[in-house]
């Protein structure tokens, strides 16, 4: 049985997302990390795909992070700018991601499913992300 590399798995998830309502909602995607150069200032919502693990044994099991970044809201309270997650938008996009990534077969031997999800606030940038772990299994 031919096993898939991490790069091949990322490509499969990337290609799949581009066909789903998640991509319609958030069409800006990056592999491995978001741009950090001064010439590319972050704006709006975006998705970053990374691999966590790719265990190749009798059964191949790989985990991919699908991170959906949403800008924080920044209201002023007592003339001080505050940062708060946009929980409504994070919830909306996470539900779209669940529906887009849940239980889909790649071919007769590979199957992806949502494993878990958590919210993470970024300290260096004014974003909160929905970190969705998607697991590929080969049967």
Question: Residue locations for each model-derived region?
Answer:
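Charged, amphipathic alpha-helical segments and their flanking helix caps
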Residues: 1-26, 50-139
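A short acidic/basic microdomain associated with nuclease active sites
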Residues: 25-37
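A short beta-turn/loop motif at secondary-structure boundaries
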Residues: 36-41, 121-125
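A short, hydrophobic beta-strand-centered structural micro-motif
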Residues: 41-51
């Amino acid at each position: 049985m031919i096993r898939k590399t991490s790069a091949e798995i990322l490509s499969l998830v990337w290609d799949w997302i581009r066909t789903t309502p998640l991509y319609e909602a958030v069409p800006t995607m990056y592999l491995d990390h978001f741009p950090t150069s001064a010439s590319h200032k972050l704006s709006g919502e975006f998705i970053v795909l990374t691999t966590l693990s790719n265990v190749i044994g009798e059964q191949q099991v790989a985990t991919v992070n699908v991170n959906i970044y949403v800008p924080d809201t920044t209201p002023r309270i007592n003339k001080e700018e505050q940062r708060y997650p946009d929980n409504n938008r994070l919830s909306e996009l996470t539900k779209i991601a669940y529906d887009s990534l849940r239980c889909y077969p790649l071919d007769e031997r590979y199957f992806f499913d949502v494993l878990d999800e958590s919210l993470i606030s970024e300290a260096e940038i004014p974003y909160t992300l929905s970190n969705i772990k998607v697991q590929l299994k080969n049967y």
